[in-house]
Amino acid sequence: MRRSDWELMAPAGSEEALSAAIEGGADSVYFGVGRLNMRAHAAGNFRADDLPRVMDRCRAAGVKGYLTVNTVLYDEELAEMKDLMTAAAKARVSAVIASDMAAVLAAREVGLPVHLSTQLNISNTEALTFYAQYAETAVLARELNLNQVRCIADAVRDKPILGTGGEAMRLEMFCHGALCMGMSGRCWMSLHTRGKSANRGECLQNCRRTYNLVDRERGTELALENGYVLSPKDLKTIDFLDKMTAAGVTVFKIEGRARGADYVRTVTTCYDEALKAIADGTYDAKRRAWDDRLATVFNRGFWAGYYLGAETAEIVHSYGSCATEKKVFVGRLVNY
C-alpha cells in the first residue's frame, strides 16, 4: 500500500483554514460559496470571484479543490446556482459536491465532475449504481457500519460499478468531526423550531442545547441528569483507520468548515500521518500520540460513530468544546 492510494480531504471554511489544510498535508479541500452550501453562514465563506484565486492556490500546492453546492434548491435559486457552476467551470474547480439533482445536472452540463454528498444517504449498492451515472465519487451514509461499507466496496470492484469517467466509483467517508442528530445530516429540527433549515445551510444547532422530558398525559416534567439528549459526540476514526482502508474507503473526509484553522491544521496533520503509517506498517505504535493531539483542538468528546456497529449515538455531557488546551483570544490579525 502507498499513501497515494488514499485521498485526505480537509475543510476550507476560510482563507486561514485553506492554508492550514494545505500545510497539514491534505490531498484535497472543500469549500462553499455564498448561500448555496451547507455552511452558508460560516464566517469565512468564499465568493464566486474568489474561485480563480482559490484554485490557483490549490493547483500550486498540488491539491484538488471541491466546491460544495449541497443544499436543497428552490426554483428561484436555479439561475444563481447555474451562474455559480459556470464560474466554477471557468476557475477549473476539480469537482462539485452536490445532492440536489438540479445541481448535479447543472455541474454535468458545464463539464464539472460530480461528487455525491452524504445528504443523499447512499446506503446500498443499488442506490450507488443508480447515482453512478452522474458522478465519479460518492460519500456513503454516515450510519453504515464497516461491514456494510465493505459489501458496497466489493460490489464496486466485482460488478463493477463505474462512474462517469469510466473508472470504478470512489467511496468517500467522513473520518473526523461533528455528527448531526439527523440521518446523514438531514435534519428539520432547526426549521420547525426557528424557521431556519439545516438542509439549506442555516442550522441553529438546537440539538446542542439541554432538554427536559415531559409526560404529556400527566403534565409531569422531568429534568434529566444529562440534558444533552440530542447532541452526539464528535466522530474520531484514527484509532481504527486501518479498518476503514481495509473496508474499501479511498477518500477520507474531515468535517469542520465552521471550525478554526488550528483545528484544521492539527486534524489534517494527524490523519495524514496515520495514512502514511498504515502504508509503511508503523500505524499501531503511533495511535496514542494522535489521540492526545486531536484532543487539544475543538471537540465535543469523541466516539467511533456507527462504523464499528454501534446502534445508538454517544451523547455529550457538557456544552461547547472539551479540548484539553484552552485558547485565549488576544486580537484580530488585519494584515500579514
Which residues fall in each region the model found?
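Surface-exposed amphipathic alpha-helical tracts and adjacent flexible/coil segments at the periphery
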Residues: 1-24, 28-40, 54-55, 59-71, ...
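Aromatic- and glycine-enriched glycan-recognition loops and surfaces
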Residues: 43-52
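RNase H-like DDE/DDD metal-dependent nuclease/strand-transfer catalytic core used by mobile genetic elements
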Residues: 107
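Short, conserved phosphate-binding/catalytic loop or strand-edge motifs used
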Residues: 110
